[in-house]
Amino acid sequence: KDYKKIAKTRRQRGYQWEDTLVKRFNSLEGWKAFRLGSPSVALPDVLVVNNKKSVIFTIEAKSGTGTTLFVPYDQIERCQKWTNNFEVYKMRKVILAFKFLSKKRIGTGKYERRKLHEFYKVWGNKKKAVNCVCTYNGEMYESSNGKRKELRLNDLPMPFKSKYQIITK
């Protein structure tokens, strides 16, 4: 029963993060964002367009209370497929949006306070999709057979204001 409750809490956090991103984009002139559906469907979490600026983003959104957030390669691939199909847009980007919540899990049902962090990493349209991990400090790693290999992904300054966005060097 506890596992069902934990899974539900994680899903709710994910939906809230997606909803937050949609609201932030939709509050801006010229931007339109949409949540595209459930994880079982082969769709990105969020689709964002700006027709005047000829921009399309597909976003895979991850949030949590741990020290790392994981993105499976197939979720990156489905974002790439969508982004690459909309050739009419001059700027097409796959964005991995990470939100580390202000409470850090330190045990079952135990948390401690920390600063909320947000990272928006660009996954290249032609870059091969791999399982990857983002750390609380914004470092990216490829995760393969229990081994970590550094990944260099650029940060994308968002068109909306977020006092929690951190640009890594």
Residue ranges of each PLM-predicted region?
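Short, conserved, surface-exposed binding loops centered on an aromatic residue
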Residues: R24, G37-S38, V49, V88
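Conserved catalytic cores of phosphodiester-cleaving nucleases, focusing on short active-site segments
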Residues: F25, V46-V48, S54-T65
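Acidic-basic catalytic patches of nuclease active cores, encompassing PD-(D/E)XK
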Residues: K1-G37
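Short, charged, amphipathic alpha-helix that recurs within catalytic cores of restriction-modification
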Residues: L69-L101, I106, K115
